[in-house]
């Protein structure tokens, strides 16, 4: 449950900038919402000493509700359009966009939930999730400042809190972020990517998250269909530990 440190530091820092940067409000909403889901899972698992916390369906329902509220905000506020910026074609104002129309709604769900669970899968090896998330959040901070997007305070807060956390999370780890940290961070990265129009580059910058997720999908799919495991253990970072 060490992720409470990251979440608390990020939220408190961001609150100082809400008046001047109102765009960080929806990011805080999703980050805290996903963090609460993770906290409940960790509390049931550790605090109540249960073998498992929330089951996958319960987590997914919570994630769907929070993402749905955020998506409704996007579509009604006009904060962003229904297009995705094609990488390396320009910035917000002069870049080329892939207009998805109504498909933008399921795309947002896919991006946010995919990122959230990808970060969650990556957590489990000392310093791995923290270091990769620092790289992605730093990239987003540079973009946020360069595009004057109005969300740089929260991206910077994420980087700062993670740098402090990493000191105690590298091998041998003294503190672990748990689901409260990984789900909060995953939700934040997904939402930030949408608001910055960097959905495509998220796949590149967060390549480790993609690989971890695909390893779980392949492992589960292979076992269900053929009764055989591809990896000794999934997500894939556990395969290389054994």
How should each PLM-predicted stretch be described?
Residues 1-6, 58-63, 130:
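Select subsegments of transmembrane alpha-helices in polytopic membrane proteins
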Residues 6-39, 70-77, 82-84, 88, ...:
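Alpha-helical transmembrane segments
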């Amino acid at each position: 449950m060490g992720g409470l440190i990251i979440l608390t530091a990020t939220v408190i820092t961001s609150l100082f900038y809400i008046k001047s940067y109102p765009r960080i409000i929806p990011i805080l909403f999703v980050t805290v919402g996903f963090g609460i889901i993770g906290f409940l899972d960790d509390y049931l698992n550790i605090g109540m000493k249960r073998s498992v916390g929330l089951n996958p369906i319960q987590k997914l329902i919570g994630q769907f509700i929070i993402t749905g509220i955020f998506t409704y905000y996007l579509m009604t506020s006009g904060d962003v359009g229904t297009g995705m910026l094609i990488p390396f074609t320009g910035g917000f104002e002069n870049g080329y966009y892939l207009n998805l129309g109504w498909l933008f709604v399921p795309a947002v769900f896919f991006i946010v939930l995919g990122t959230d669970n990808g970060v969650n899968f990556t957590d489990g090896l000392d310093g791995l999730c923290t270091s990769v998330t620092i790289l992605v959040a730093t990239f987003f901070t540079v973009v946020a400042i360069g595009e004057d997007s109005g969300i740089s305070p929260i991206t910077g807060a994420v980087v700062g809190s993670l740098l402090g956390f990493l000191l105690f999370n590298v091998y041998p780890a003294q503190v672990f972020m748990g689901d409260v940290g990984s789900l909060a961070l995953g939700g934040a990265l997904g939402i930030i990517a949408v608001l910055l129009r960097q959905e495509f580059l998220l796949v590149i910058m967060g390549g480790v998250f993609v690989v971890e997720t695909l390893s779980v999908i392949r492992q589960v799919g292979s076992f269900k269909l053929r009764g055989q495991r591809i990896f000794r253990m999934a997500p894939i970072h556990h395969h290389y530990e054994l």
